[in-house]
Amino acid sequence: MMRIASQLTFCSPDEIMRRAVVELDEQKIITRLFSLDGNAVESAQTLFYDGILSAEIISVKEQVSMLDNLASEYNYIDLSLGIPTEIVASEKPLLLDFGTHSPEKINQIFAGLTQVISAFSIFEIIAACCYYPALVVGEGASLSANRKTKILLWEGSDLVNKRITKQTRIRGIS
């Protein structure tokens, strides 16, 4: 069993937990998700990280054949084709598709993406990379008990202003 905690845990756009522990079994299935607030002591054998925890980034392009249909429901941006000069916020949820699951490749794209997505909060960006793609491919989107997923750490972001920075990086921790 593995326990991971950080300042913030992105479960869904409507649920962002502070000081939460994600408990995973050997198969990477979440067994529990709980807050440390109100506990007299810290959870034993918990790895603490500086940043935001989320589910894994999903590439819709790798799993969905009818990408044209996405435009009616999402502000779909295919970053595997290059970084756009501008991403305009719309009524539709933003969906960022890196065309890969590799944190190294995603971090390379992030380096050039910072200015283009500066109008969006870090939580909108995490939802665009993790939550909405999971909905599209039919997986459980919320970070919750019984979900099998890799856990990512979003580090180097501005947690006070809830923005990404040029130092923002992701890495797999489970």
What are these regions (language model features)?
Residues 2, 12-78, 85-87, 93, ...:
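Histidine-rich, glycine-flanked metal-binding segment
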Residues 82-88, 104-109:
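Well-ordered, non-membrane alpha-helical segments in soluble/globular domains
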Residues 93-174:
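His/Asp/Glu-enriched, well-ordered alpha-helical/loop segment
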